[in-house]
C-alpha cells in the first residue's frame, strides 16, 4: 500500500484514543469530534450529527458546546473516545486511556471500552497496569520488543516464550 492508501485505512478502520486526549483547545467538543470526519470527507451536516451521537454515547450530550478546558480529565477522555467512535471504526486503539485519571473515572472509561467490545468493536488497549490488563480477554505482553506472553487473561498456562523463561529468542520482536 502507498501512503495515501495507508492513510485511508487508518481513517476508515481505526479509532485512536490517546493517553493525553489531544483535544484542540479552541474547538468545542462537537468540533473536536468532527475533525477526523472532516479529513474523511464526511459532509458537514452528517459530521455534526455523528459527533453529537458519539458524544451522547459517552455521556457528554449536555456538554456539546463546551471547550476542553471546561471539562474534567475524565470528561476530556470520554470526548477523546467519542472522537475515536465517530468514524465508526472496526478497531479502537487505546493508549493508556486511564493513565491520567483517578480510579473511579478510570473504571468508568474501562466499562465504556468493555461495552464497545461487547457491541462488536475490537479494542486494543495498551497499558502498564496489570490490574487493567487482566480485565481483557487476551493479553499480549512485550518486554524489550519481544512477545513474552500471549494468552487468555485468566489462563496462567498460556504460552510464554523461551526468552521470558530466561532463554534466548523464541518470541517475535
Language-model segments: which ranges?
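Conserved beta-strand-loop-alpha-helix hinge in the C-terminal portion
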Residues: 146-173
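ABC family nucleotide-binding domain
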Residues: 1-142
Amino acid at each position: 500500500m502507498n501512503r495515501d492508501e495507508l492513510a485511508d485505512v487508518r481513517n476508515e478502520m481505526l479509532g485512536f484514543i490517546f493517553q493525553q486526549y489531544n483535544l484542540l483547545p479552541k474547538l468545542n467538543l462537537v468540533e473536536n469530534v468532527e475533525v477526523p470526519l472532516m479529513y474523511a470527507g464526511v459532509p458537514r451536516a452528517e459530521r455534526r450529527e455523528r459527533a453529537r451521537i458519539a458524544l451522547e454515547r459517552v455521556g457528554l450530550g449536555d456538554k456539546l458546546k463546551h471547550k476542553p478546558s471546561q471539562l474534567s480529565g475524565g470528561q476530556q477522555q470520554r470526548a477523546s473516545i467519542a472522537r475515536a467512535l465517530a468514524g465508526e471504526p472496526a478497531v479502537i486503539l487505546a493508549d493508556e486511556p486511564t493513565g491520567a485519571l483517578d480510579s473511579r473515572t478510570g473504571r468508568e472509561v474501562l466499562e465504556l471500552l468493555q461495552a464497545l467490545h461487547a457491541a462488536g468493536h475490537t479494542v486494543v488497549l495498551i497499558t502498564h497496569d496489570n490490574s487493567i490488563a487482566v480485565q481483557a480477554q487476551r493479553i499480549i505482553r512485550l518486554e524489550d520488543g519481544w512477545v513474552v506472553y500471549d494468552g487468555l487473561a485468566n489462563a496462567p498456562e498460556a504460552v510464554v516464550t523461551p526468552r521470558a523463561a530466561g532463554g534466548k529468542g523464541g518470541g517475535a520482536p
